[in-house]
């Protein structure tokens, strides 16, 4: 993957095709690069990460956390939780930000995404 799939970047999150077999716009490699980029450009030391139950989520969450960790970020793995739980963690736990691996309101099982916040700000 040389370029970011720009059409997946929305106003408040990242969403796109993410099949459980690792194909689509949002691949495990994309998630790893996203973790590395967030660690590099946001300058956070700790991140909370939650996830939903879509087929593609385990690989995306694992690679996102690996990218964050390999860049020096301490990751608090919240497990399978709601998006609200990740936001609550950002407000109440000693973390600099959070990421929820979810396609949010999209009903298609072939899609997934990332909702991110930095402190109390959605990014």
Specify the residue positions occupied by each region the protein language model found.
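An N-terminal, well-structured beta->alpha segment
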Residues: 1-64, 70-71
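Conserved small/polar residues in nucleotide/adenosyl-binding loops
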Residues: 121-123
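Ferredoxin-reductase
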Residues: 39, 45-119
